[in-house]
Amino acid sequence: MKFLLPTSKSIYNMVKYMSIILLTLLSSCISTGKWNEMGRKRFSLSRFSLHANKGEEEKIKNMIDLNSIYKEITLSPPPKENYTYQTYIYRFYKDGKVGIFSDYNLDPMRATMGIYEVKNGKLYIEYYWHSVQAGYYRVKIMIDKHNEQLLGYSEDYIYSLKKENINGDFSDEPDW
């Protein structure tokens, strides 16, 4: 019985291909973005379909006040019985950046990073959210001004964004 022994060339090719496969798998797992000092995920701005443009705040000054915060109130679907929706707070910054907060600690380092852009007179917000079931997924909201009320529309929900004036230092800039 004759056995074929691998040649050094075939071993070299096998190691080369296995190395390429391993590096591809590892790089896809670790190149998802970076984290800031507060443990918040920071994505590359190139992953967003909207663009954080310089001077974007000039286009929204009649709609959004950069010195206020906006509290999200879910209008539709109606709240389920004995279920409380998490309320989020939006803070708009200059140059097309928006922070989404789960409480009134408005430190930009603790915010979920988001981008806003004005298109055809409507304000669009985009951010990445995390859930245990889905991992990171993209959320897009269109905001339209109806009289003095801001309404946000996503794929699943309709929101009202209630303006709240707060006192404080608004000089903090986001880290994205």
PLM features per residue range, with description:
Residues 1-39:
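Bacterial Sec-dependent N-terminal signal peptides
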Residues 29-112, 119, 124-176:
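Lipid interaction determinants
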